């Protein structure tokens, strides 16, 4: 478990993306944050200003007296800050040179360059947030839809933390009772204690199940669905990509083989984030460039969470169509019967019967039934959970894996009791479940896990 400490060196980093813009923010956190910035700041004495104030002045190189930039310095004193340390944020003009010059001056005057995610790590170590809230910080930054942002904000406010700590408390209450009975066996009725253990294990396991039921939806909102748009050449793949992205990223022509590679784009479809991959048409070709595109398309199909398979409804099924139906069998897919405006030689009913998949008839060029296609994508992966703003979702594999581990440990408790094992032996798995749940929030997480998690954060956060 990571020790709760407040004695760190002072760190600095640029918190805004590098490049030209209105402003850049350089963040400084630590015991000497105010003193270090004050050495460079010409204006009010920052060591005497009230907390949570914004102060106008200039950053000046103390070695040369050169003015670097006109800035606003926000002073926030511990403990009412993100890291629970003293923080100064320097708002300077946006630009690579000026921002880096200010950072280098801070480093030359006593600050250390922050590691990726170190500000958030300090917030965790100092007890400001738990691990689920730390993860939600990056989820907010990376959110690709409004719903993903809402879920991340809910988690940042402690939604999952509250649920997990309540489960741990249920286990702890029973563990305390077991410990007393082990210490004072003359007062123990082992059958009664075993019944309490079993009842608690079943109750907590049921609540874990309800959380795990949200894991698919939560991880889709967080990571998006890899969605491959496939079909033989010139059936409308690029037209569908352009409709969903509202762009002309893919070249649309009547020439087969126009898309020679895979094109990727992130879009929100009814609140579901899709990583759309427009694949090259899969067909026999002697063109070496097209061959590479076809192989990449097959790889994209293998890795996809969802397949949008386009067929030309104005023509009979070709051998290439049948190969694609076979290649995508077993994957979650929607068959899009395109070009209904040209007359139909294929019907949705017969394709659905032959393929066992959902089928939508449409004319992408005429924008017919495309809203129904979007609704079907949402229906395939969501069960109404995403419509509730109050629902707590499990949003990543780490959380889901630890919940599953705790559930298995509780199942071992139940099977052990049913097999007649002594309570003090069964208690080991019961304590294990309590610790597994604690790893989710960081209450009992090993240092290696903590360091690995925060290393994935961006610099300056």
UniProtKB/Swiss-Prot annotation:
<keyword id="KW-0378">Hydrolase</keyword>
<dbReference type="InterPro" id="IPR027266">
    <property type="entry name" value="TrmE/GcvT_dom1"/>
</dbReference>
<feature type="binding site">
    <location>
        <begin position="234"/>
        <end position="239"/>
    </location>
    <ligand>
        <name>GTP</name>
    </ligand>
</feature>
<dbReference type="InterPro" id="IPR004520">
    <property type="entry name" value="GTPase_MnmE"/>
</dbReference>
<dbReference type="InterPro" id="IPR025867">
    <property type="entry name" value="MnmE_helical"/>
</dbReference>
<feature type="binding site">
    <location>
        <begin position="278"/>
        <end position="281"/>
    </location>
    <ligand>
        <name>GTP</name>
    </ligand>
</feature>
<feature type="binding site">
    <location>
        <position position="258"/>
    </location>
    <ligand>
        <name>K(+)</name>
    </ligand>
</feature>
<keyword id="KW-0460">Magnesium</keyword>
<protein>
    <recommendedName>
        <fullName>tRNA modification GTPase MnmE</fullName>
        <ecNumber>3.6.-.-</ecNumber>
    </recommendedName>
</protein>
<dbReference type="InterPro" id="IPR018948">
    <property type="entry name" value="GTP-bd_TrmE_N"/>
</dbReference>
<dbReference type="GO" id="GO:0002098">
    <property type="term" value="P:tRNA wobble uridine modification"/>
</dbReference>
<dbReference type="InterPro" id="IPR027417">
    <property type="entry name" value="P-loop_NTPase"/>
</dbReference>
<comment type="function">
    <text>Exhibits a very high intrinsic GTPase hydrolysis rate. Involved in the addition of a carboxymethylaminomethyl (cmnm) group at the wobble position (U34) of certain tRNAs, forming tRNA-cmnm(5)s(2)U34.</text>
</comment>
<dbReference type="GO" id="GO:0003924">
    <property type="term" value="F:GTPase activity"/>
</dbReference>
<feature type="binding site">
    <location>
        <position position="128"/>
    </location>
    <ligand>
        <name>(6S)-5-formyl-5,6,7,8-tetrahydrofolate</name>
    </ligand>
</feature>
<keyword id="KW-0479">Metal-binding</keyword>
<comment type="similarity">
    <text>Belongs to the TRAFAC class TrmE-Era-EngA-EngB-Septin-like GTPase superfamily. TrmE GTPase family.</text>
</comment>
<feature type="binding site">
    <location>
        <begin position="253"/>
        <end position="259"/>
    </location>
    <ligand>
        <name>GTP</name>
    </ligand>
</feature>
<dbReference type="InterPro" id="IPR006073">
    <property type="entry name" value="GTP-bd"/>
</dbReference>
<dbReference type="InterPro" id="IPR027368">
    <property type="entry name" value="MnmE_dom2"/>
</dbReference>
<keyword id="KW-0963">Cytoplasm</keyword>
<feature type="domain" description="TrmE-type G">
    <location>
        <begin position="224"/>
        <end position="382"/>
    </location>
</feature>
<dbReference type="GO" id="GO:0005829">
    <property type="term" value="C:cytosol"/>
</dbReference>
<feature type="binding site">
    <location>
        <position position="234"/>
    </location>
    <ligand>
        <name>K(+)</name>
    </ligand>
</feature>
<keyword id="KW-0342">GTP-binding</keyword>
<dbReference type="Pfam" id="PF10396">
    <property type="entry name" value="TrmE_N"/>
</dbReference>
<dbReference type="InterPro" id="IPR031168">
    <property type="entry name" value="G_TrmE"/>
</dbReference>
<keyword id="KW-0630">Potassium</keyword>
<feature type="binding site">
    <location>
        <position position="255"/>
    </location>
    <ligand>
        <name>K(+)</name>
    </ligand>
</feature>
<feature type="binding site">
    <location>
        <position position="27"/>
    </location>
    <ligand>
        <name>(6S)-5-formyl-5,6,7,8-tetrahydrofolate</name>
    </ligand>
</feature>
<comment type="subunit">
    <text>Homodimer. Heterotetramer of two MnmE and two MnmG subunits.</text>
</comment>
<dbReference type="InterPro" id="IPR005225">
    <property type="entry name" value="Small_GTP-bd"/>
</dbReference>
<keyword id="KW-0819">tRNA processing</keyword>
<dbReference type="Pfam" id="PF01926">
    <property type="entry name" value="MMR_HSR1"/>
</dbReference>
<feature type="binding site">
    <location>
        <position position="253"/>
    </location>
    <ligand>
        <name>K(+)</name>
    </ligand>
</feature>
<feature type="binding site">
    <location>
        <position position="259"/>
    </location>
    <ligand>
        <name>Mg(2+)</name>
    </ligand>
</feature>
<feature type="binding site">
    <location>
        <position position="89"/>
    </location>
    <ligand>
        <name>(6S)-5-formyl-5,6,7,8-tetrahydrofolate</name>
    </ligand>
</feature>
<dbReference type="GO" id="GO:0046872">
    <property type="term" value="F:metal ion binding"/>
</dbReference>
<feature type="binding site">
    <location>
        <position position="238"/>
    </location>
    <ligand>
        <name>Mg(2+)</name>
    </ligand>
</feature>
<dbReference type="Pfam" id="PF12631">
    <property type="entry name" value="MnmE_helical"/>
</dbReference>
<dbReference type="GO" id="GO:0005525">
    <property type="term" value="F:GTP binding"/>
</dbReference>
<dbReference type="GO" id="GO:0030488">
    <property type="term" value="P:tRNA methylation"/>
</dbReference>
């Amino acid at each position: 478990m990571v020790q709760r400490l407040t004695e760190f060196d002072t760190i600095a980093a640029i918190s805004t993306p590098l490049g030209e813009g209105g402003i850049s923010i350089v963040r400084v956190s630590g015991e000497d944050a105010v003193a270090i910035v004050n050495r460079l700041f010409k204006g009010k004495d920052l060591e005497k200003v009230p907390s949570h104030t914004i102060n106008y002045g200039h950053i000046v190189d103390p070695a040369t007296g050169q003015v670097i930039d006109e800035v606003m310095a926000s002073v926030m004193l511990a403990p009412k800050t993100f890291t629970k340390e003293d923080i100064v944020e320097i708002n300077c003009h946006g630009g690579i040179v000026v921002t880096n010059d200010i950072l280098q001056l801070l480093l030359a005057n006593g600050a250390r360059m922050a590691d990726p995610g170190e500000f958030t790590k300090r917030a965790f170590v100092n007890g400001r947030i738990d691990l689920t809230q730390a993860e939600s910080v990056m989820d907010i930054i990376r959110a690709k839809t409004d719903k993903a942002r809402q879920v991340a904000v809910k988690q940042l406010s402690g939604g999952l933390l509250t649920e997990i700590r309540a489960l741990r408390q249920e286990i702890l209450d029973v563990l305390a009772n077991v410990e007393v009975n082990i210490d004072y066996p003359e007062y123990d009725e082992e059958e009664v204690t075993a019944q309490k253990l079993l009842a608690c294990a079943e109750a907590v396991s049921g609540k874990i199940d309800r959380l795990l039921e949200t894991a698919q939806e939560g991880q889709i909102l967080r990571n998006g669905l890899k969605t491959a748009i496939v079909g033989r050449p010139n059936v409308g793949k690029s037209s569908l990509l352009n409709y969903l992205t509202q762009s002309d990223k893919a070249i649309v022509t009547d020439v087969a083989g126009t898309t020679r590679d895979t094109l990727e784009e992130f879009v929100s479809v009814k609140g579901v984030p899709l990583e759309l991959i427009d694949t090259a048409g899969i067909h026999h070709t002697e063109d070496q460039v097209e061959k590479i595109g076809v192989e990449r398309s097959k790889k994209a199909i293998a890795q996809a969470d969802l397949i949008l398979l386009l067929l030309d409804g104005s023509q009979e099924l070709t051998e290439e169509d049948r190969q694609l139906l076979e290649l995508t069998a077993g994957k979650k897919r929607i068959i899009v019967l395109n070009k209904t405006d040209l007359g139909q030689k294929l019907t949705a009913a017969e394709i659905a019967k032959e393929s066992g998949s959902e089928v939508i008839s449409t004319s992408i060029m005429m924008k017919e039934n495309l809203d129904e296609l979007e609704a079907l994508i949402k229906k395939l992966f969501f069960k109404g959970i995403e419509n509730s703003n109050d629902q707590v979702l499990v949003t990543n594999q780490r959380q889901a894996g630890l919940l599953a581990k705790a559930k298995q440990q509780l199942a071992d408790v139940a099977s052990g009791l049913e097999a007649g094992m002594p309570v003090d032996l069964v208690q080991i798995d019961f304590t294990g479940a309590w610790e597994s749940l604690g790893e989710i929030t960081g209450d009992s997480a090993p240092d290696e896990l903590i360091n690995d998690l925060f290393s994935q954060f961006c610099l300056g956060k």
